[in-house]
Amino acid sequence: MKVSIVGITGYSGLELVRILNGHQKVELVSVHATKEIGTKLSDIYSYLKGICDLEIQSFDSQKIMATADLVFFATPSGVAKELAKDFIAADFPVIDISGDHRLPAAIYEKWYKKAAAEQASLDKFTYALAELTDVKGKKFIANPGCYATATELALLPLVKEKLIDVNSIIVDAKSGLTGAGKVLSESSHFVNVHDNYVTYKLNRHQHIPEIVQELKRFDNNLEHIQFSTSLLPVNRGIMATCYVTLKKPLSNEAVSKIYQDLYADKPFVRLQQDLPELHNVIGSNFCDIGFAYNPVTNVLTVISVIDNLVKGAAGQAVQNLNLMMGWDETEGFPMTPSYL
């Protein structure tokens, strides 16, 4: 299968290159961006020399459709909704890593502060949390956000079984600096991040409605969550610490069984006896989950960790590609995290 990437110079685009390079059933045939046109990708990123020496091309939907079988969009929000139109009209497969096709139009505009995609386009896309969504045969995939992936995987077993007061959910999520994107901002400047801990977009992060939307599918009583986002002085990784009030006390063994039952055949979700740590998933498509119950407060703390660029972006996109095509969902993935 031949694929193209639009938005190649961002972190998610580069991570797609790394993962697809090891995929035996996929060939990357073109990469596209708005700058550095005509330059070899490996001349900009020397670590790719001999691995991906493709020249960066300007965006041309017709050329992509003539040479590839599917296109990934690894673009900032607001871009894919416009550039994907030709592909949608031609019924040409798209996996959108951005947030442009995840939410209803009115909700997108409220949280992203941008005009939404056309309704006809939104209707084509399937929001695909890979562990829970059947995407075989689908052509248009809205890849979940990084914070949303970590939070949904942590909480869905409890919400699905209706074991918690869904309006008691509090999530304290922390991300490595790549989660803030490549464009430099005051909050991501080295001197403000190094040896520091920064909270940003408190109560305003655009992944909040995405999480509510997906959890609400399993318990319609859910109306809101309390959600905070912070930057860690590390390159990669997300840790979502979720606090929920149980409807009735549960033993750790009972909680563990609930998670095991849902994720038993999900190769990228690992339940840890100890509380998860970031470096155990870095460079991988794993989501590690652990928990601890406090019988005094009747609060269950669930912690999930992912690599924001892999499971939170490019990795889940490739996992969804595998599932779309009916391949083994682990196809192309190095199964060992880099750890250090």
From Swiss-Prot:
Family annotation (InterPro entries): AGPR_AS (IPR023013), AGPR_type-1 (IPR000706), NAD(P)-bd_dom_sf (IPR036291), NAGSA_dehydrogenase (IPR050085), Semialdehyde_DH_NAD-bd (IPR000534)
Pathway(s) of this molecule: Amino-acid biosynthesis; L-arginine biosynthesis; N(2)-acetyl-L-ornithine from L-glutamate: step 3/4
Broad class of where this protein is predominantly found: cytoplasm
GO cellular component terms given for this protein: cytoplasm
Pfam family of the protein (one): Semialdhyde_dh
Swiss-Prot/TrEMBL catalytic activity: N-acetyl-L-glutamate 5-semialdehyde + phosphate + NADP(+) = N-acetyl-L-glutamyl 5-phosphate + NADPH + H(+)
BP GO annotations: L-arginine biosynthetic process
Keywords assigned by UniProt, alphabetized: Amino-acid biosynthesis, Arginine biosynthesis, Cytoplasm, NADP, Oxidoreductase
SUPFAM superfamilies (UniProt xref): Glyceraldehyde-3-phosphate dehydrogenase-like, C-terminal domain, NAD(P)-binding Rossmann-fold domains
Compartment list: Cytoplasm
Transmembrane segments: none
Role noted for this protein: Catalyzes the NADPH-dependent reduction of N-acetyl-5-glutamyl phosphate to yield N-acetyl-L-glutamate 5-semialdehyde.
Family listed: Belongs to the NAGSA dehydrogenase family. Type 1 subfamily.
UniProt-recorded name of the protein: N-acetyl-gamma-glutamyl-phosphate reductase
Organism: Streptococcus mutans serotype c (strain ATCC 700610 / UA159)
